[in-house]
């Protein structure tokens, strides 16, 4: 994802929840700095005690009002009530989710309150195992972004 973002001219920074990722190609920052500086946050982390509800109300409060939040990792990394609040209160601009905390989406999921597709997009989670699946998906994303730009 980082290399694709760079192709679009993005300055890529990252936070490692484990501290083990030492990728020299991109600037590593702490979580607070990631939240404050990012125009777009894309989550790609395992679910563990350190990441469960990592993105809570306090995290969304620190993000830019113009920020876009994307979670393609695990649903429970995000406090869905906090995300609903952040979208309703315009604390962030928008969110796109490929995963939820509980799938299929329950009737009582707070995200159901967000009816504006400009604020929230939820897509079905697809398996990433086959290389062809990833290539097809990324090619589609690339083409869609090109159309917008």
Regions found by a protein language model. Give the residues of each.
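Preference for short coil/turn "hinge" residues that link or interrupt alpha-helices
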Residues: 21-22, 27-28, 40, 47-48, ...
